[in-house]
Design a protein with these regions (language model features):
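N-terminal membrane topogenic signal
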Residues: 7-26
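Long extracytoplasmic/lumenal interhelical loops at the membrane interface
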Residues: 244, 248-284, 311
Length: 378
């Protein structure tokens, strides 16, 4: 029996040629996510079964994407970016509402969120633009990249979904960062730093006064003093912090968390699922979660840096840093260190669209490692 299973695994590996170590880490984290999801739903298997279906579909997407050569992604980048922008415009014109925002596009046979696609499309497009010539890039490709990022960010912010807009914008900026791009407005380094700081302050001022709407401003202000509105805008943060703090070293045990079982923790199966983990598994559970995340991030960076072409290195490194950003933002959000922006915890939170996007990202990283041989880059 063991020999039969081993042979099947060997055939599977030879056919797909994926990175086994990364897959093992992903499955470990997914298993932990299912356990916490079971607990957050009050010991019900309903959400667990549905998440298992999502995981199966998302894993299939990862395996398919892992077979796509990076060269095909690079050549398809302009079409993908144009298609993504068109879909974002269609969302603003004909999109359906959900959760107070116009984010979904309903085609009758399928309902999806185009902004989820842009989490992958933007890094692919920017990496394609910047990798056409030697690095660090010259001014023209950088300007084109910034314009493309700005268009996508503004269209998503208009839905409104500022959290997703900023994170997608960051995914494009990460590609610029890894390309070695440096902002040099003037020769004097101190004057250059002052000008950059002035531009950033001006952008923040403009965003606060002309881009952010009232509830988004309230979320930011609540961050500094959640006790000022404990039953309103500060409720999420306060209940989450109580749950995290009450977990102690070893936690209260699976399905034994008082904050989660009594429904004090909001969105405990999605955005605030980390609060459930911290309350029921304590500091040890947090270290376990952080350790698996660290292994995944290290492995993804390791696979990306082994690549022999600029496009693959830029794309792999930026997608890995996007994963880190989502982890950091979610944990910071539920801990009261960052505003509540509705970001799921990767491979732990319940959800289908975000999971598909994440697994597709893993598929891309596996693909650039699989096709790192020079013969794929011609």
């Amino acid at each position: 029996m063991i020999y039969f299973i081993f042979n099947k695994i060997k055939v599977f590996y030879r056919f797909f040629k994926i990175d086994t170590l990364l897959l093992v880490f992903i499955m470990l984290l997914s298993g932990l996510g299912l356990l916490i999801l079971y607990s957050s739903s009050g010991g019900s298997f309903d959400l667990v079964y549905r998440q298992l279906i999502h995981l199966g579909l998302a894993t299939s997407v990862m395996l398919v994407v892992a077979q796509i050569p990076p060269l095909l992604l690079m050549r398809s980048a302009p079409i993908l970016m144009l298609l993504g922008i068109i879909l974002l415009i269609l969302v603003l014109l004909f999109g359906s509402y959900g959760g107070g925002a116009q984010r979904w596009l309903n085609l009758g046979f399928i309902k999806f969120q185009p902004s989820e696609m842009m989490k992958i499309i933007v890094p692919i497009a920017i990496a394609s633009i910047l990798s056409e010539r030697t690095l660090p890039p010259r001014a023209l490709p950088v300007i084109i990249s910034l314009v493309g990022i700005a268009i996508v960010v503004l269209l998503i912010a208009k839905q409104p979904d500022l959290g997703t807009a900023l994170l997608i914008g960051a995914s494009g900026i990460y590609v610029l960062f890894f390309s070695g791009f440096r902002i040099r407005l003037v020769k004097n380094p101190w004057l250059n730093l002052g000008l950059i700081a002035g531009i950033l302050v001006s952008l923040l001022y403009a965003a606060w006064n002309y881009l952010l709407i009232s509830y988004q401003k309230n979320r930011i202000l609540t961050l500094f003093n959640p006790e000022s509105d404990p039953l309103g805008s500060g409720y999420h943060i306060l209940q989450s912090k109580i749950a995290i703090g009450s977990g102690g070293l070893t936690g209260k045990g699976i399905t034994n968390g008082s904050q989660s079982r009594l429904d004090f923790v909001p969105e405990q199966s999605t955005d605030f699922i980390f609060s459930v983990l911290a309350e029921e598994m304590g500091f040890i559970g947090f270290i376990l979660l952080l350790s698996i995340y660290t292994l995944i991030i290290y492995r993804c960076f390791n696979l990306s840096l082994r690549c022999e072409d600029n496009f693959s290195r830029l794309l792999g490194a930026s997608l890995t840093f996007v994963l880190f950003t989502y982890i950091f933002v979610n944990m910071g959000m539920v801990s009261g260190l960052l505003p509540v922006v509705g970001v799921p915890l990767p491979l732990i939170s319940y959800g289908g669209s975000s999971l598909m996007t994440l697994m597709a990202s893993f598929g891309i990283i596996m693909s650039i490692h699989k096709h790192k041989s020079p013969r794929y880059l011609q």
